UniProtKB/Swiss-Prot annotation:
Function: May play a role in DNA repair. It seems to be involved in an RecBC-independent recombinational process of DNA repair. It may act with RecF and RecO.
InterPro entries: DNA_Rcmb_RecR, Rcmb_RecR, Rcmb_RecR_Znf, TOPRIM_dom, TOPRIM_RecR
Listed name of the protein: Recombination protein RecR
Domain annotation Toprim: ranges: 83-178
Protein encoded by which gene: recR
CDD domains per the UniProt record, alphabetical: TOPRIM_recR
Length: 201
């Protein structure tokens, strides 16, 4: 059993920071110390921003993006092409594609990918919402921008099958996205090239 080195409030801060992806216990301790040292410049404003986000952030009922409005800013932007829909696994993938700035379209966030080994099936993802959006008839192309993993490929094939009865072109990102790679880690140039070289399934 390890000794406590600080009061319960600091220990709780460290424990919560350690649950953030990419931060382990050691990094969480360093981050906590940095925040405490910069209390007025960082810790207090960060606490306020987190409280405000907890109160105001919503999941878009149309596409699954996170925003402070529902529908989100992307879904209500009339300058975007309503006939083209990019399907992504997570919001981080949507943000990565937006950073690439190649296409001015709308999105659909699945909320994950099919993974039978992890017990994640079609009903656990926002696939039904995607089918409903395509069934409306306004969408002419669905671009599957899922990760190039085994689970991502499985998800792409399942979605293609679900959309096969609709008059919609289904494409996917070109294989410039490395197998096993995740969109959030790719640079803007790679993402832009992959979007331009997409192929029909």
């Amino acid at each position: 059993m390890s000794k406590r080195i600080a009061g319960p409030e600091i220990e709780r801060l460290i424990q919560l920071l350690a649950r953030v992806p990419g931060l382990g216990p050691r990094s969480a301790r360093r981050a906590a110390l940095h925040l405490i040292k910069k209390k007025e410049a960082l810790l207090v404003p960060l606490g306020g921003a987190m409280q405000e986000a907890a109160e105001k952030v919503r999941i878009c009922s149309c596409c699954g993006n996170v925003d402070t409005s529902d529908p989100c800013t992307i879904c209500t932007d009339e300058r975007r092409d309503p006939a083209t829909l990019i399907v992504v696994e997570d919001v981080s993938d949507l943000w990565a594609l937006e950073r690439a700035g190649t296409m001015n379209v709308r999105y659909h966030v699945l909320g994950g990918r099919l993974s039978p080994l992890d017990g994640i099936g079609p009903d656990d993802l926002n696939i039904k919402g995607l089918v409903e959006r395509v069934a409306s008839g306004a969408i002419k192309e669905v671009i599957l921008a899922v990760n190039a993993t085994v689970e991502g490929q499985t998800t792409a094939h399942y979605i293609t099958d679900q959309l096969s009865n609709f008059d919609v072109r289904v494409t996917r990102l070109a294989h410039g996205v490395p197998v096993g790679g995740e969109l959030d880690y790719l640079d803007e140039g790679t993402l832009a090239a992959a979007l331009r070289a997409r192929t029909t399934l």
